[in-house]
Each structure stands twice: as C-alpha cells, then as structure tokens.
UniProtKB/Swiss-Prot annotation:
Phylogenetic lineage: Eukaryota, Metazoa, Chordata, Craniata, Vertebrata
Official protein name in the record: mRNA turnover protein 4 homolog
Superkingdom per UniProt: Eukaryota
Protein purpose: Component of the ribosome assembly machinery. Nuclear paralog of the ribosomal protein P0, it binds pre-60S subunits at an early stage of assembly in the nucleolus, and is replaced by P0 in cytoplasmic pre-60S subunits and mature 80S ribosomes.
Predominant place of localization: nucleus
Gene name as annotated: MRTO4
Amino acid sequence: MPKSKRDKKVSLTKTAKKGLELKQNLIEELRKCVDTYKYLFIFSVANMRNSKLKDIRNAWKHSRMFFGKNKVMMVALGRSPSDEYKDNLHQVSKRLRGEVGLLFTNRTKEEVNEWFTKYTEMDYARAGNKAAFTVSLDPGPLEQFPHSMEPQLRQLGLPTALKRGVVTLLSDYEVCKEGDVLTPEQARVLKLFGYEMAEFKVTIKYMWDSQSGRFQQMGDDLPESASESTEESDSEDDD
C-alpha cells in the first residue's frame, strides 16, 4: 500500500535551523543599519494595523523600519554596556517591550518628529477596544443592506425585520456607549454601519545618535523591558 503524502515526516532539526538562520539574518541586518544610518528612533504603535504600517514603510523607503521580534532586536543591539554593539545601544534594548519598533534614518529629529506627529489614520475598532463615542440607531428602513443581510443583523442583536423586502430597524437601538469595552458583536455592528473609532498612530519615543552615541527621550516614557519572558508582536520584522 503506497504511503500517503500526509505521512511525510518533517525534521524538527531542519525547522529549528531555519528559524535560527532567520534570526541571525535579522541580527546582521539590524547591525548593518546601525553602521549605515545616522539616527535610530524607537516608536510605539497604537491600534496596530499591518496595512497602515505598510503605508508608512512605503513613505519611508529611504529609511528602514523594523517591527516585532523584540528579543532578537535586543540581542542584535546588546542588553548591557558589556555586550552592546555600539555605545548606549543597551538603552534602546531596555525600551523594546510591547508594540514598539525601530526606525533607522538619515532624516533629522525635527523632520521625523514633524512627519509622525501629523500622521494619523482612522480604522474600525476591534473587540476589546473602548468605544470613542456613543452610537444610537434610529428606527426605519436600512436600505444600505440587501434583504439577505437581515438574519445576520438580527443575530447581532438588532431589532430588525423585512418590510416589503426592505431591511427595517423596528425600534431605537443603542450600539454602544462612550467608554464601553466593545464586544465582537458591537465591533461588527459598528463596522457594518461605517463608524470608525480606532486611531492608528505611530509615536516617536526615543532617539539614538550613531555619531555621538547619545540616547535621548522624545515622548512619554516606555516601561523598560523586563526579561526573556517579554511578550512580543508576531508582526513582520521588516519589508
């Protein structure tokens, strides 16, 4: 009896080796950027959206951005004065915790700060986000929805029915109150009705100067990285 292709064994050693190679490549890339660019900025991200971070990468093609893999970035830069790649880079590693990233650039502090201060994009809130404002729906026809959507709206909790083939809201309905922690159902309803509440924002927090080795704070402080147990994003590291 021929063996099924599904029975093919995968060598864990090969998988581990590939993962190690990827980490080593990232370490080399980071150190190359340290040697190439004048400035290194640490940024934090609110309401992370991969598509919007990609837009920023495209706008900053003259520079390099890394996001995620905090532990690997810490290894590349060094965690202490004794093993840091260049002077004061251990100060950068201390701040690599949570949804933060690195921007390597030759643009000045003023140029970077001005661009990112102005940049903001709205998107739909997700479950677990807080409602930015109260949303209430008035009764009446919901002509933006095809009749086939009515069962789904009802399942989400809306008091709807079909009247002459038109989806109709039968009574007032409060989707959420300002400050509510949104449920998956509330987030879905807000998206269906076009209410954007999540502000995607990148904030510059710190700067490291490669020529002087100076490390300085630019925004509100970030908590220092704890240890190996630091939770990190699985987002793509680089473009």
